[in-house]
From Swiss-Prot:
Disulfides per UniProt: C401-C413, C407-C422, C424-C438, C444-C457, C451-C466, C468-C480, C486-C499, C493-C508, C510-C521, C525-C535, C529-C541, C543-C552, C559-C572, C566-C581, C583-C600, C606-C619, C613-C628, C630-C636
Cellular compartments per GO CC: cytoplasm; extracellular region; extracellular space
Function: Plays multiple roles in neural tissues, regulates neuronal proliferation, survival, differentiation, polarization, as well as axon guidance and synaptic functions. Plays an important role in axon development during neuronal differentiation through the MAPK intracellular signaling pathway. Via binding to its receptor ROBO3, plays a role in axon guidance, functions as a repulsive guidance cue for commissural axons, helping to steer them across the spinal cord midline. Required for neuron survival through the modulation of MAPK signaling pathways too. Testicular luminal protein that signals through a ROS1-pathway to regulate the epididymal initial segment (IS) maturation, sperm maturation and male fertility.
Gene3D superfamilies: 2.60.120.200, 6.20.200.20, Complement Module, domain 1, Laminin
Glycan attachment sites: N53, N225, N293, N298, N517, T548, N615, N635
GO biological process: commissural neuron axon guidance; fertilization
Record-linked Pfam families: EGF_3, EGF_CA, Laminin_G_2, VWC
Higher taxonomy: Eukaryota, Metazoa, Chordata, Craniata, Vertebrata
The protein, known as: Protein kinase C-binding protein NELL2
Broad class of the protein's primary localization: secreted
GO function terms (MF aspect): calcium ion binding; heparin binding; protein kinase C binding
UniProt subunit comment: Homotrimer. Binds to PRKCB. Interacts with NICOL1; this interaction triggers epididymal differentiation.
Amino acid sequence: MESRVLLRTFCLLFGLGAVWGLGVDPSLQIDVLTELELGESTTGVRQVPGLHNGTKAFLFQDTPRSIKASTATAEQFFQKLRNKHEFTILVTLKQTHLNSGVILSIHHLDHRYLELESSGHRNEVRLHYRSGSHHPHTEVFPYILADDKWHKLSLAISASHLILHIDCNKIYERVVEKPSTDLPLGTSFWLGQRNNAHGYFKGIMQDVQLLVMPQGFIAQCPDLNRTCPTCNDFHGLVQKIMELQDILAKTSAKLSRAEQRMNRLDQCYCERTCTMKGTTYREFESWTDGCKNCTCLNGTIQCETLICPNPDCPLKSAPAYVDGKCCKECKSICQFQGRTYFEGQRNTVYSSSGVCVLYECKDQSMKLVESSGCPALDCAESHQITLSHSCCKVCKGYDFCSERHNCMENSVCRNLNDRAVCSCRDGFRALREDNAYCEDIDECAEGRHYCRENTMCVNTPGSFMCICKTGYIRIDDYSCTEHDECVTNQHNCDENALCFNTVGGHNCVCKPGYTGNGTTCKAFCQDGCRNGGACIAANVCACPQGFTGHSCETDIDECSDGFVQCDSRANCINLPGWYHCECRDGYHDNGMFSPSGESCEDIDECGTGRHSCANDTICFNLDGGYDCRCPHGKNCTGDCIHDGKIKHNGQIWVLENDRCSVCSCQNGFVMCRRMVCDCENPTVDLFCCPECDPRLSSQCLHQNGETLYNSGDTWVQNCQQCRCLQGEVDCWPLPCPEVECEFSVLPENECCPRCVTDPCQADTIRNDITKTCLDEMNVVRFTGSSWIKHGTECTLCQCKNGHICCSVDPQCLQEL
């Protein structure tokens, strides 16, 4: 008991603290009339006395007006309202009798995010909104608000929960699709009208407010009961549970993947390495390759030219090249006969008698090398060559390179008469004097190429290439000429574009009747394609099933055109883009929905009490109806029972809630029909017979601003039935057949949902929280929850009443 009292106290304090006692928190309040700064200079409205004197009241007159919040003011409103799921609309009003008008409208282009409307034509209050699934919805609340009397109206929205209070009485309470307040930039706010031309409210408004808080209706009616928690609070708790469930599933999946990776890592050691000339180097390892310093970085070899220092050599040594190394090092020297020799160098000396003596620099002195004899030569003496480093002669053309040379990277060995020398390959330059090491010459950067105009020079190892620029073709290795891609059909123009050749390229221009950048051209239909039609050629629309016409503007009446054959117990009802076989009076659907109406079965009016037979007669059920029979020998009155009241046989009356319908009692049967319109009768009721109103002022302009309708005309616009009545357009939701099934889908460009058996095709489900799903990680999922399938990045799964439905997100795949 104590906990219940504490909870109630908390709810009262929480609900009241922001609303009254200290007044409404300004950060939660949008005072519309004050913020719009209506005054004497505002066309179409004027200040008048209100229900009370505490705030200003304004009369919205039957004249052209534009009561719209400025862009800055509207954005101030929306900053408070955007992405909020708990708010209340409050208004005190006195609406002119029979007027149908918009109280306030928040819309962007053709999308009504929040619009409150009162129809005096049909005696109902309507709320138009968009749900989180971006579908338009309309809730209709039958109530006479346009009666020239003062009323206080509040509409509280808490997530998917609506409560309508009128004059501090709860009139309606509903669960609906959750409204979306994700208002885009550029959204407009209108008061007393939908736009400049439609939805004019006529009457007085006072205290127009939006309170962004729970149970805002207590600001208008402090004595009303409060509920705790609100529907939005409950939705928040459910959402948190789903989020925690999703976090648990994702954490479990990450842990599983981490364990798998750890197991694999335990079995191997991975390190990025580099391989050069058969040798493998570890990450960050550096080495010298010829005349370059190289490093292994992230598995890639990066080399830079080696900068050789000048060695400071001691006495009896000098800088010299060493085999296998790029830079000079200090080597021992010998002085002999006025010349300098490096360690290991040899020199011959011939005596006066012609005897050859061979010396070698060793340990800083020239030492005698013992002769080991020379091989016999197979050439004439005149073709024998004396060498400076050997006492043995060789024949002309001797291959010194085959003995030994020090030619390294990009260098080749060449034979001279008496020795071998190194020479750089074509396209390379020497890195040192003996040409043992060479580097590539960048002919392109140094301008040492022969590429002519219309080409681009590309350097290659030891050479270069001349590449043709885009739009040119090759003449020879060094030159290119202009290429006509249009003639050779080597362009990227769309099939519905014209190709124009230019210097170095081409231009694409869409053909007349098509629009785009030339590479992509789409057909253009000047009047547009309505009802989901697609423009497939210039001013040619491909219409979806159920529509026809130049712009797909005409609904095909499948019922009158003979396309449909409904069961004898059903009537064919045409709908935009579709049709429906609706059970005739006296029949109802048995729950086994059939498109042709075969599921219609007889209603037992007698057993269910749905008959009008008076107490002195007996009801007999018939197929599709009933009969009121008088017992044998009894004199029956033939009276009827209608709405719980006795109507005498032959009596005629007008329905209380529909002044345009006339009913009569005939021998126990009640028959109702619309009033017959006699336009010749000067006293004809123009409300019931608007077609009898010839005044031009009673005509209406279609929402597109192009079509003019006479009073009484009807049409369908955006899944709403619209009617012109004495100059005012009133639209209400198109009546849809009852969908008695677990899964339903609203096809694109249609107005009414259809039943489907596959839950994965359904966009509307009768959620059953007792039906859960077990995902691939054995995690229990509630109905309505969604998750990314384990092991994937773009497969989204959803639990639908115990069924798991998965689909791949194409946009996610493109972003990978």
